[in-house]
Amino acid sequence: MKKFLKYLLVLIILILIAGIVFLFRPIASKQVQTAKDEPVVDAVLVGGGIMSATLGTYFTELEPNWQIRMYERLDQVAQESSNGFNNAGTGHSGFMEMNYTEEKNGKMEIAKAEKVASQFEVAKQFWSYQVKQGVLAEPKTFINPVPHIAFVWGDNVKFLEKRYAAMIQSPLFKGMKFTEDPAVIKQWAPLVMTDRDPTQKVAATRMEVGSDVNYGSITKQLVNHLNQNPNFKLQTSTEVTGISQNDDKTWTVSFKNLKTGKTDHVKTRFVFIGAGGAAVKLLQLTGLPEAKQYAGFPVGGEFLITDNPAITAQHTAKVYGRAELGAPPMSVPHIDTRYIDGKKYVLFGPFATYSNKFLKNGSQLDLLASTNKSNVLPMTTVGLENLDLVKYLVSQVMMSDEDRLNELRKYYPDAKAEDWRLSQGGQRVQIIKKEPGKPATLQFGTEIFASKDGAVTALLGASPGASTSPYIMLNLLEKAFPQQTEGKWNQKLHEIVVSYKQDLSKDPVLLDKVRQYTSSTLGLNYTSPFKAANDETAAAPVAKAN
């Protein structure tokens, strides 16, 4: 027995030593020796998703002569989180997402919903501009009119009524309708009311101007157009393996062709890491001190999906419920109309899954590989402080098919198991951030990372993500290129996004013009709720330059 305990103690000590060695291993890329006369490109985009495609499109419009390179590890672009089946396709506008509004001290706070709604208006303007320029094809190939509905029952009816009363005070939510009449709700969303208990108290709000968006289609179309530019080069099946700074302050991005095994590198003045969940891991390769404050917590999602015409014909809406008390924001249940590659689906979820992968097509070693001496303590602290989240994830992972069907029946009482299949969605990585002098926090939104000189940028986090990609990338341009956005790029940015630098929540006239223009261009449903609509011809509103 003593001998066994001795060996056990030695084993524990060896494991501890190995763990310490692992945590203190160098994670930054080694500097690559490059030739002095080696060409330098203007921008490298890591990842072939909607963020890189959007930023690349901005670049080609603002600087047509820039040399741009895009590297994607899969054999096609838009196959991770941007893929139509890997996300809910919501054009997040704050109309129905009740987690964007909360009641504090008896007052309904709608600022976050206004922020998200304003950002999606930027997205619609960006896409409208691309349609006008012939970059994006027929709008129905990527966006379709789908009303957004918030639906509740029981004790949540009062919450929704208060939410509605607060939201219609903002120009962004003018035109929202509220009802407690089951017959009206059945007209709006028949599936939700079919065979529902007639004694159950229900309520709903509706915004007609809502949309369903295929971000995979947008990504592919933007990249196809970028490929027509001789200054742009896309390499698929290519994994970025290193990002290191050169003595002249440029950066070298090293990569490997996953089909041939060939390695190479490129020198660049600017790097954007738009690799979804893998962004945290890739950012660590830079060795930048400000990158050390980040870690990632991966969470997956599953959806129940049907393409049965008898069901899809009855549902043209995105219906969001309210997350149960104590549940995280990612848990908001919704039953959605989806249009993917010309076919109509109905999707319900999400059901959380857990995996150590940072990408759907990633490795189970991703979480471990991103752990180091700088973030192991914040990760542990956040884990202990968010036991409710851990408990929620465990409960979700333990769900049976019958459990999931019962959840669906809360929103579609007549649902039958044979009509639905379970589909694995994309992988999201929530940010764990430890700022100097502050406690570590788990964040549920998106965050733009920019180095002090703006030469290295990244997008971290998840929701609302793709739906506000044009706004997020515009914000990134401001952080990385402040002089250009205030100077020579300013006029062009106002052409692309007419409301650039304007607060639509405080300018109902401009908001109305913008919505009429984008709805006409994108084929969305919009009837002006403002009595003095200035221009019913849906002409593009005039931009105001700074």
From Swiss-Prot:
GO terms for molecular function: 2-hydroxyglutarate dehydrogenase activity; L-malate dehydrogenase (quinone) activity. The keyword Ion transport does not apply. It catalyses: (S)-malate + a quinone = a quinol + oxaloacetate. Its cofactor is FAD. GO terms for biological process: tricarboxylic acid cycle. Pathway: Carbohydrate metabolism; tricarboxylic acid cycle; oxaloacetate from (S)-malate (quinone route): step 1/1. It comes from the Bacteria. It holds the Pfam family Mqo. InterPro entries: FAD/NAD-bd_sf (IPR036188), MQO (IPR006231). SUPFAM superfamilies: FAD/NAD(P)-binding domain (SSF51905). Its EC number is 1.1.5.4. Keywords: FAD, Flavoprotein, Oxidoreductase, Tricarboxylic acid cycle. HAMAP family: MQO. Belongs to the MQO family. NCBIfam families: mal_quin_oxido, PRK05257.1-1, PRK05257.1-4, PRK05257.2-1, PRK05257.3-2, PRK13339.1. This is Probable malate:quinone oxidoreductase. The gene is mqo.
